[in-house]
């Protein structure tokens, strides 16, 4: 979340909504939001059941209001004396909604099929990743998500893609297979211990995690304080 916070600042995003699924890890996500002090415009919890999810996304994005705005505008122009009303109506009929959204970016704290369901619902409610930032957590192991053309660009600020691709190539050369999520965590853990040891002249490891430190690994940034 600290990396996402930095990304939001660097890109000049002003209004961010945060979508959290009602899952076992919901509390951890909210705890992370609070500790990172990331600037959030509004927080929403959602039910991952498909039918309920779509209804909730419709409400969050004011979809029905924006859809009604479009229908009302078409009716208004039809009944007007505008000499160019046929062309205007034709252009309006190519749209799905009319009216702005009250956010610049959406952070989706979800994974796998559930994440895809959320992005699909956003597209259905006429929220495009080409106009609003779609941001999510570490998803580099889900190649199928990267292949979803309709939801691009989607941002994963926690990992540098170029570094990750280089790591995969090196791992493949050494072990003749692609790395798993666990192997990547192990890779970062070794780097983390080495980094902290080098800062302490390799004298002791007993107090390495008691001092506040920050380490940028392949999986993202690790913030350590009081053995946590």
Residue ranges and their predicted role:
Residues 1-2, 114:
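Beta-alpha junction/loop-to-helix N-cap segments that form part of ligand/metal-binding clefts
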Residues 25-29, 52, 186-190:
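Extracytoplasmic ligand-binding site segments that recognize negatively charged/polar headgroups
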Residues 176-190, 194-228:
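Segments of small-molecule ligand-sensing domains
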Residues 2-48:
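An alpha-beta-alpha
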Residues 89-100, 104-112:
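Extracytoplasmic/secretory-pathway proteins
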Residues 19, 107-109, 135:
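Structural motif
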Residues 23-26, 112-116:
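Short acidic, S/G/P-rich loop/turn micro-motifs used as interaction or catalytic elements
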Residues 34-46, 53-86, 101-105, 117-187:
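Extracellular/periplasmic periplasmic-binding protein-like sensory domains
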């Amino acid at each position: 979340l600290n990396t996402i916070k930095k990304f939001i600042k660097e890109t000049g995003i002003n209004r961010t909504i945060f979508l959290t699924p009602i899952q076992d890890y919901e509390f951890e996500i909210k705890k992370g939001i609070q500790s990172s002090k990331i600037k959030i415009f509004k927080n929403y919890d959602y039910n991952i059941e498909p039918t309920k999810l779509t209804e909730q996304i419709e409400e969050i994005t004011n979809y029905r209001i924006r859809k009604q705005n479009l229908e009302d505008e078409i009716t208004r122009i039809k009944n007007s004396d505008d000499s160019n009303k046929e062309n205007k109506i034709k252009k309006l009929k190519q749209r799905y909604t009319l009216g702005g959204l009250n956010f610049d970016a959406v952070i989706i704290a979800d994974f796998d099929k559930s994440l895809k369901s959320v992005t699909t619902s956003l597209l259905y409610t006429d929220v495009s990743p080409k106009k609003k930032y779609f941001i999510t957590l570490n998803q580099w192991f889900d190649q199928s998500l990267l292949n979803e053309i309709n939801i691009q660009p989607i941002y994963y600020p926690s990992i540098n893609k170029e570094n990750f691709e280089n790591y995969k190539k090196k791992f493949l050369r050494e072990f003749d297979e692609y790395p798993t999520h666990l192997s990547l965590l192990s890779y970062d853990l070794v780097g983390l211990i080495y980094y902290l040891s080098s800062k302490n002249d390799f004298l002791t490891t007993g107090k390495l995690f008691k001092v506040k430190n920050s380490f940028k690994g392949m999986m993202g940034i690790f913030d350590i304080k009081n053995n946590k």
